[in-house]
Amino acid sequence: KALKIDGAEATAENIKAGTYKIARPFNIATKGDATGLAADFINYIMSDEGQKVIEDNGYISQGSNGAFTSDGSTGKIVVAGSSSVTPVMEKLIEAYKAINKDAEIELQESDSTTGMTAAMEGTCDIGMASRELKDSETEGGLTAQVIAMDGIAVVVNNSNPMDEMSSDNVKDIFTGAVTTWDEVAK
């Protein structure tokens, strides 16, 4: 069963409202301002259509920039990084390519740090991270944009008597400060 955290259930509405706090951002990042095909694809991601793809795949949208109109950019771009962002990015690429058939988008799955490093080094056009960017990454010239939020439900066995815990309790469990349910219940 999923626990309430600080009195809030793990729902899309509560994550959007900020009352359920256990969530992480799905970020994309570019070195400087995106241009051409990369910019057009990012515009798609942040459009009504792109944010619908995000919601249809179980993530929390970030609002949109309105309806999408492609600028007709062609060529090839590389999107690289987080294995957590990859499944929804695959769906975004598929939907975008249905609109812009002349776009070639290569998706490289790795991890957030590798994606951000590739974007800083110019070996990919768009990096993906399932976390906030580190200071060193923004200082390295990356501009990030949150495309979705990923809520993380805290789940316990159905026989566990707990129905709720505080965000401090969750932190204590994952940092090892507490190791038994008796310690959490205090």
Which residues does each PLM region occupy?
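Exported/periplasmic ABC-transporter solute-binding proteins
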Residues: 1-186
